[in-house]
C-alpha cells in the first residue's frame, strides 16, 4: 500500500453508526439520533474456556525475573510489556467491543459481517504498524523506538485469542471460525494490502515494482516458561514495516516502488498456500505485474547472504506453533506425516495433506498436484535464485552504515555481503547419508566461478544455502512460483544478520550491563537500525540492476 509522505491515509476504524436524519427527527436526550434506525444486533458472549492456540499460550509468559543476569524484576508477561511499550494496547479492547459490547449485543449478526469485520481490523493493525515504523504514528516519550517490529506479532495474538473466545448467538461452524482466523492473519500481515502501480508515475517516471517479504519473531521458547527468546525481534519484519509503500529514485531516474508483507514462522500456513496466494496475483500477466520478488529473513552473525540455491526439504525444527513437519528420525525427502499425528506435546495434530519432509506448493499455482504422490523433481529439489549478485556485491552497501557494538566484518563499515553458494544433498534420495557443497567464502566481491558448483537432477535437497527452515521455504516457494509463470525477474532470498544481540557485560559487546529482564537495550536497537538500513540499500541495488537491465548470476 502506498502511503503519503508525512500523513497517514488511514486511521483506526471508529465505532460509529451512520444514520439518516428523517423529517422531524432530532437528537434524543441520551445523544442518540431520535427516529434513526439502529442496525440489527444479536446476542453474544465470551467462551473463556475455549482452547487457545500454542502461540496464544505464550501471551502470559514473562522474561526471566530472578536469578543470575537479571537486573530488573518485572514479572509482567512479555507480550503485555511490548504491546504497551509500543502504544498498541488499545487494539484488542476495541476489537473485543466490536465483537461483543458490554451489554452482550453485537451488530455482527452473520458470518459475512464477521468476515468483513476481521478484514477491517486486520488491515487497520497492519497499517498502524507500518505508520508507526515510518513516522506517521505518534510515539510517546519513553516508548519503544519506531523501528521496533515486535508489537505487531503480539498484538495479533491478543486479537486472535479474543476472536477464538467470541461466542455469537448465530451459528458459527468450525470451518467458518477457522476462516475468520485465516482472514485476520492474512489481513494483519499486509497480504491483502499489496497495491503495485501501473508502469508510469504521475510525473512520467517509470516504475520498477518490487514485492518483499519479512517474517514474524521466532524462537520464542515453550509457553509458560520464562526465557529470553520471548523478546526476540526479526529484522526482516522490521524492514518490511519500514519499506512498505515506499518509493526510491533510481540511478536512471525511474522509481522503485516496494510493497511488503509478513509471513508466519509455522509450516501449516505455507502448506495452505499463504505465500503463493499473496504473490500469485502479482505474478500473473497484466499492467501491474511485479518486476522483482525478494524474500528476506534473519540468518547468521554479521553477514548478509545472497542465497544461490533454495531447497525443497523441511528440517526438524518446530515452528512457532510447535509443529514439526520432518521428524529427525524420519528425515527422508519422500516422508509424509500421517494425518492426525501430533509432533510435539500440546500442539495441534497434523491436518493438511502432504505435510512432510518435502515442500509441496499448491496445485492452483503450481499447475499440478505434488502432494498426493512424491516425485523427485516435480517440483525441483533445488531452485536457483535470480538475483543480480554481481551488481549487489559491487554496490558497497555497507558504506555509511554505523556498525553496532560488538559487530565485526571485513568491510570498513556495516556488514559484509557474500554470495552464499552452499547446499547439502542426499546422493541417494532413499538413504539418509548427505554430502555438502561449501560456500565460496568470498566477501564483498564476486567469487571465482569455479567455486560455484550447481546441483544435478539426480540428487535430493537436504539444505538450501540458508538451511532447511522456513526462511529457505519462503525462498523456495518464491522461485518455484517464478518458474511456474516463466518469469525472468530478480527473485531470490536475502538472509540478513542476526539482530537479537543484547549487552553481555563485556567490552567486546559494548560494555553495557546484561539484563535478561529487559525488553530492549541500545545494542539491540543499534543492530536493528543498521540491518534495516543496509537491507534497504541492497533492495535499491536490485532496483538499479533492473533499471540497467542486468542479468541474474
Q: Where do the PLM segments sit?
A:
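Bacterial N-terminal signal peptides
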Residues: 11-22
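Sec/Tat signal peptide C-region and signal peptidase I cleavage site
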Residues: 24-28
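Substrate-gating cap/lid alpha-helix
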Residues: 466-471, 475
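An aromatic- and histidine-rich active-site surface loop
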Residues: 504
Amino acid at each position: 500500500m502506498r502511503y503519503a509522505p508525512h500523513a497517514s491515509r488511514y486511521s483506526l476504524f471508529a465505532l460509529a453508526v451512520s444514520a439518516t436524519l428523517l423529517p422531524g427527527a432530532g437528537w434524543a436526550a441520551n445523544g442518540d439520533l431520535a427516529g434513526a434506525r439502529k442496525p440489527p444486533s444479536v446476542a453474544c458472549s465470551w467462551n473463556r474456556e475455549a482452547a487457545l492456540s500454542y502461540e496464544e499460550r505464550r501471551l502470559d509468559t514473562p522474561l526471566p525475573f530472578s536469578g543470575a543476569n537479571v537486573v530488573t524484576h518485572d514479572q509482567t508477561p512479555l507480550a503485555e510489556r511490548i504491546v504497551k511499550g509500543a502504544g498498541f494496547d488499545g487494539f484488542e479492547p476495541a476489537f473485543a467491543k466490536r465483537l461483543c459490547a458490554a451489554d452482550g449485543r453485537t451488530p455482527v449478526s452473520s458470518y459475512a459481517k464477521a468476515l468483513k469485520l476481521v478484514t477491517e481490523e486486520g488491515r487497520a493493525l497492519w497499517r498502524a504498524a507500518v505508520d508507526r515504523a515510518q513516522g506517521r504514528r505518534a510515539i510517546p516519550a519513553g516508548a519503544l523506538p519506531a523501528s521496533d517490529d515486535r508489537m505487531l506479532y503480539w498484538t495479533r495474538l491478543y486479537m486472535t485469542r479474543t476472536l477464538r473466545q467470541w461466542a455469537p448467538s448465530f451459528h458459527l461452524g468450525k470451518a467458518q471460525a477457522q476462516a475468520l482466523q485465516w482472514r485476520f492473519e492474512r489481513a494483519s500481515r499486509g497480504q491483502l494490502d499489496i497495491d503495485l502501480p501501473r508502469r508510469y508515475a504521475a510525473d512520467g517516471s517509470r516504475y520498477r515494482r518490487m514485492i518483499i517479504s519479512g517474517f514474524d519473531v521466532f524462537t520464542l521458547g515453550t509457553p509458560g516458561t520464562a526465557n529470553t527468546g520471548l523478546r526476540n525481534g526479526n529484522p526482516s519484519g522490521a524492514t518490511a514495516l519500514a519499506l512498505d509503500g515506499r518509493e526510491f529514485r533510481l540511478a536512471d531516474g525511474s522509481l522503485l516502488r516496494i510493497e511488503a508483507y509478513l509471513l508466519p514462522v509455522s509450516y501449516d500456513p505455507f502448506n495452505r498456500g499463504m505465500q503463493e496466494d499473496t504473490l500469485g496475483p502479482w505474478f500473473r500477466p497484466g499492467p501491474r505485474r511485479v518486476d522483482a520478488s525478494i524474500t528476506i529473513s534473519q540468518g547468521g552473525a554479521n553477514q548478509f547472504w545472497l542465497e544461490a540455491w533454495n531447497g525443497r526439504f523441511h528440517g526438524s525444527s518446530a515452528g512457532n506453533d510447535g509443529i514439526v513437519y520432518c521428524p529427525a528420525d524420519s528425515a527422508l525427502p519422500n516422508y509424509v506425516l500421517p494425518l492426525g499425528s501430533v509432533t510435539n506435546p500440546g500442539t495441534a495434530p497434523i491436518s493438511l495433506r502432504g505435510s512432510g519432509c518435502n515442500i509441496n506448493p499448491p496445485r492452483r499455482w503450481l499447475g499440478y498436484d505434488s502432494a498426493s504422490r512424491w516425485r523427485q523433481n516435480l517440483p525441483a529439489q533445488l531452485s536457483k535464485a535470480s538475483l543480480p549478485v554481481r551488481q549487489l556485491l559491487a554496490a558497497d552497501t555497507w558504506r555509511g552504515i554505523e556498525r553496532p557494538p560488538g559487530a565485526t566484518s571485513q568491510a570498513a563499515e556495516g556488514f559484509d555481503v557474500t554470495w552464499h553458494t552452499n547446499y547439502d544433498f542426499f546422493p541417494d534420495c532413499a538413504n539418509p547419508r548427505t554430502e555438502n557443497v561449501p560456500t565460496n567464502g568470498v566477501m564483498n566481491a564476486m567469487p571465482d566461478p569455479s567455486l560455484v558448483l550447481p546441483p544435478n537432477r539426480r540428487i535430493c535437497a537436504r539444505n538450501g544455502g540458508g538451511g532447511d527452515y522456513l526462511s529457505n521455504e519462503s525462498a523456495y516457494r518464491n522461485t518455484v512460483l517464478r518458474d511456474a509463470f516463466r518469469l525472468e525477474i530478480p527473485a531470490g532470498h536475502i538472509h540478513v544478520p542476526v539482530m537479537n544481540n543484547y549487552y553481555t557485560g563485556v567490552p567486546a559487546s559494548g560494555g553495557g550491563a546484561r539484563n535478561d529482564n529487559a525488553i530492549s537495550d541500545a545494542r539491540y536497537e543499534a543492530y536493528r537500525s543498521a540491518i534495516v538500513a543496509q537491507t534497504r540499500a541492497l533492495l535499491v541495488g536490485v532496483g538499479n540492476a533492473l533499471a540497467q537491465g542486468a542479468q541474474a548470476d
